[in-house]
Structure formats: structure tokens, C-alpha cells
């Protein structure tokens, strides 16, 4: 999962000039590095806890990640390389300042919760040393004083670094990215060996009968099929591709097809890393079927000892810090007079409090799906505004042209899409959260185009000139 788009923040309110455009190599390295993150150590085991079969797992991952790559390539990058604006400035020109402020609030809250999940990942390392009780899959509340202290200590440390030393953390993250990829390969090799895989001749037999067996899910988990895996793999980064957050990233790309570089992150990162992480959980269950806890610290320690623990710390550290930084920036936009460091520190403390409650990390897949469901509609608005409005004789960037503080057509489309998603969940069950964003995208597009017609009719005839 992507957490920090490390591209420079220059040209925040103007198109990126040609001399600042970047080549393909920049994007291959960035995607490969940022998608082998702390979240992978949680998500991989959760597939296994969901009782997925080997075929559904591998086929779903392959197709879902392919759809994610195509979404970046066909939806995000073509607009990004034509307009070359940040997401926030692009939205401001369409929606008006007030709606962008609301978007920032929601985005900041989501980033804060995700940072809390990464703090939880790293805190599990302390549990290996101090032997306090750590959360299980079914836990929703703190499991004891030791857990609370470990999480708060980790969170405070991460918050201080995010507030004071982001440049150092970003440089460190880029430095260790190759190590992270290598270590996930090592995790996978060790996991498969311990499960009895000796070569390609018995790989599928072991994978389908001893690892991804397709049995009943762990208590409290949703049973996963091919469709669950496919849609989750596709939509776990929905905010970035269909949700258009990566307009800010690809505005620097020389060509729109550079978005194919996202395959490095999807297949080297998500595909490989999720498989590797889930094998570690299989090893744990083989040793003790009653030990269903999904805890990255113990999982990595059992595989690689102290080096495994170091990987967990680095993965959580390099993921949580840029996530806290982004959350701080989102909230600082609401109070420009406050220092970024102070806002980031407060945000980090809030993330630490959320991290105490294991329900966040144990339901990480559902949280990621909900995040996409809430923010995806604004990506649909951007898509419709750029490609569809001119085809129907309407003007793009209406808020900029008539100085609207809030584009009610965009706001209504956002609300209608979310309400439609919630309605589907109420009708068909909360376990369908991995699917509802697909039809809801079309709802957002249709509502925005229809209401934009009414909105633009209320302005002078030359508005569409």
C-alpha cells in the first residue's frame, strides 16, 4: 500500500514546467520501494485468516494488481500529464476552497488512523522482548498495561521524528527500500521451506493443501473468494489511482504511460510481499493451530530472529513517519498559522491513541476499503470534469471561473456516492465493503454530470465559451 509520494512539493499552484519533468526510472524505483511497507506484514496473514484457497489467492492477486496498474495508466496519468497540477489545486479549481477543506479533514483523519496501524505493527516488536500480552484477531480493546505503554512509547517516538526529521526519514526509507524487498523474499523462502516446499514439483500441492487451503475463516473474519482478493488488490490503493490522489505524483511524468511502472509496486510489492507474509502466518499455525494472532513482530522473529524484528521496525518506521507527515500537512491547511511541526506532533499523538485499540489493525483490510469508499467519489468528479463535461458542452474547472466557494454539484455527487455505498452495505451486509465502491463510482459520475448541467445554466451564457 502507498503511503508517501516522495516527489518534491514544488509547483503547488501552477503546472509543472517541462524542465522539471521526470523520466521512467524515477517512477519504477519509487513504486517498487513504497509498496513494500509495514502494512504488507499485516495484510498477507489476514488473507490466510480469511480462509482463502490457493487458486483464489494467486489468481485474485494477479488480476487485481493488473487492474490497479491499468487504473493508474488509463485513469490517473492521462489527466495528470495533461493538466500537471496537484490533486488539491485541481480539486480547488473544480470544487471550490470549502469543499477541498472538507476533503482535507477526511483525508487527514484517514491518514492518522493508518499511521496508528503502523505504530501498532512496530509495537509488536516490544512484545517479543517484554512478553506482555498482545492482541489477537478478535480483540478490539487494549490487552493490558504493557501493550498500552509499548504503543504510546512507539507512537511518541515516531511522532517526534515525523515532526522534526522528515527529510532524514525519507532519505533513510529510500536507502533501506532494497533491503526491505530482499527481506520479504527471504521471508517467503523461509516460510515455504518450513511448510515443506522443496521445489516447483511440490509447490502447488503444499500451497493448496497446507497453506491456502480454502477452509473456514478465523472467527470474526470475512470468508475470502477470488472476487474478494481481486477487488481488494485492485481497490486497496483506490484513493491513489481511481481516487486521483496520484495526480500529484504523475504531474511530473514526461509521458502518461510511465504509470505502467506501478507494476513494480503491485507485483514486487503487493503480490510478492503479501504471499511472503502469509507464509509466515502459515508456519505459525502449523506450529500451534490455536495461535491465531496476527502479530508482525513474533511472525518475523520466528522466521529470521533479530533480523526479522529489525525489518518490522524499519517497515513500520518508514511507513508511519511519512504517513504522519502527510496527515499533518492535511490538518495544517486548516490552520495555516500553526507550525507544521506542532500540528504533526499533535496528529502523531492522536494516531498513538488509535493504535492502542487493536480493532484498527486487526480490521485493516476493512479500513482500507472504507477509506477508498469515502474518498473515491472525488476522483470520479475529477474524471467527469475533465473528460465528460466538455463533451456535453460544459466548462471544466467551474469553481475557478465563477469563483465558487463550494461547487454543490461536486459535493452532492460525493455525498450521493457514499450514501449509495452505505445503502448497499445495509442491504447486503458489511462484508460487501470490498465491492461497493465499484458501482458507487458510476453514481458519482452520473450525479456530477447531471447536476453540473443545472449548475452551469445558472451562470451567464458565455461561461461555456
What are these regions (language model features)?
Residues 1-56, 212-214, 218-231, 250-258, ...:
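Membrane-interface "cap" regions at the ends of multi-pass membrane proteins
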Residues 49-51, 77-78, 94, 102, ...:
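Membrane-water interface regions at transmembrane-helix termini and the short interhelical loops
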Residues 62-95, 104-119, 284, 447, ...:
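Juxtamembrane transmembrane-helix boundary signature
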Residues 100-138, 316-333:
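Hydrophobic transmembrane alpha-helices that form the core helical bundles
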Residues 123-124, 179-216, 231, 238, ...:
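Hydrophobic alpha-helical segments and their helix-loop junctions in multi-pass secondary transporters
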Residues 132-164, 178-187, 227-246, 271, ...:
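Transmembrane alpha-helical segments of multi-pass small-molecule transport proteins
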Residues 149, 153-205, 260-266, 367-380, ...:
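Membrane-interface loop-to-helix entry segments
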Residues 379-465:
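C-terminal membrane-solvent junction of multi-pass transporters and transport-like membrane proteins
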Amino acid at each position: 500500500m502507498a503511503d508517501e509520494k516522495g516527489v518534491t512539493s514544488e509547483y503547488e499552484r501552477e503546472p509543472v514546467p517541462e524542465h522539471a519533468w521526470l523520466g521512467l526510472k524515477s517512477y519504477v524505483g519509487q513504486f517498487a520501494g513504497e509498496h513494500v511497507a509495514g502494512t504488507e506484514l499485516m495484510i498477507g496473514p489476514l488473507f490466510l485468516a480469511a480462509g482463502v484457497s490457493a487458486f483464489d489467492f494467486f489468481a485474485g492477486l494477479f488480476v487485481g494488481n493488473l487492474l490497479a496498474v491499468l487504473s493508474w495508466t488509463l485513469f490517473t496519468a492521462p489527466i495528470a500529464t495533461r493538466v500537471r497540477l496537484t490533486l488539491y489545486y485541481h480539486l480547488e479549481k473544480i470544487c471550490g476552497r470549502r469543499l477541498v477543506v472538507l476533503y482535507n479533514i477526511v483525508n487527514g483523519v484517514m491518514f492518522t488512523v493508518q499511521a496508528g496501524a503502523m505504530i501498532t505493527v512496530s509495537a509488536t516488536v516490544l512484545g517479543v522482548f517484554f512478553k506482555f500480552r498482545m492482541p489477537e484477531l478478535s480483540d478490539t480493546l487494549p490487552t493490558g498495561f504493557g501493550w498500552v505503554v509499548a504503543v504510546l512509547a512507539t507512537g511518541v517516538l515516531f511522532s517526534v521524528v515525523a515532526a522534526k526529521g522528515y527529510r532524514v526519514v525519507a532519505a533513510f526509507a529510500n536507502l533501506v527500500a532494497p533491503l526491505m524487498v530482499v527481506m520479504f523474499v527471504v521471508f517467503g523462502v523461509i516460510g515455504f521451506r518450513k511448510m515443506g516446499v522443496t521445489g516447483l514439483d511440490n509447490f502447488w500441492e503444499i500451497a493448496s493443501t497446507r497453506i491456502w487451503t480454502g477452509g473456514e475463516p478465523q472467527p470474526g473474519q470475512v470468508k475470502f473468494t477470488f472476487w474478494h482478493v481481486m477487488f481488494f488488490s485492485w481497490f486497496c490503493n483506490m484513493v491513489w489511482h481511481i481516487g486521483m490522489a496520484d495526480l500529484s505524483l504523475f504531474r511530473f511524468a514526461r509521458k502518461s504511460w510511465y504509470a505502467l511502472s506501478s507494476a513494480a509496486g503491485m507485483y514486487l510489492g503487493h503480490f510478492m510481499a503479501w504471499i511472503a507474509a502469509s507464509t509466515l502466518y502459515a508456519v505459525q499455525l502449523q506450529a500451534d493451530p490455536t495461535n491465531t494472532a496476527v502479530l508482525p513482530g513474533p511472525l518475523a522473529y520466528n522466521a529470521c530472529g533479530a533480523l526479522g524484528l529489525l525489518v518490522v521496525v524499519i517497515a513500520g518506521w518508514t511507513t508511519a513517519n511519512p504517513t504522519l507527515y502527510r496527515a499533518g500537512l492535511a490538518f495544517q491547511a486548516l490552520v495555516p498559522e500553526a507550525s507544521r511541526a506542532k500540528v504533526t506532533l499533535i496528529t502523531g499523538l492522536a494516531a498513538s491513541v488509535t493504535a492502542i485499540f487493536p480493532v484498527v489493525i486487526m480490521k485493516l483490510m476493512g479500513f482500507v476499503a472504507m477509506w477508498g469508499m469515502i474518498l473515491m467519489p472525488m476522483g470520479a468528479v475529477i474524471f467527469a470534469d475533465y473528460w465528460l463535461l466538455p463533451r456535453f458542452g460544459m466548462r471544466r474547472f467551474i469553481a475557478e471561473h465563477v469563483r465558487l466557494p463550494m461547487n454543490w454539484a461536486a459535493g452532492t455527487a460525493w455525498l450521493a456516492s457514499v450514501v449509495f455505498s452505505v445503502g448497499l452495505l445495509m442491504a447486503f451486509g458489511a462484508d460487501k465493503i470490498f465491492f461497493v465502491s465499484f458501482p458507487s463510482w458510476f453514481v458519482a459520475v452520473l450525479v456530477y454530470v447531471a447536476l453540473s448541467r443545472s449548475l452551469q445554466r445558472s451562470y451567464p451564457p458565455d461561461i461555456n465559451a
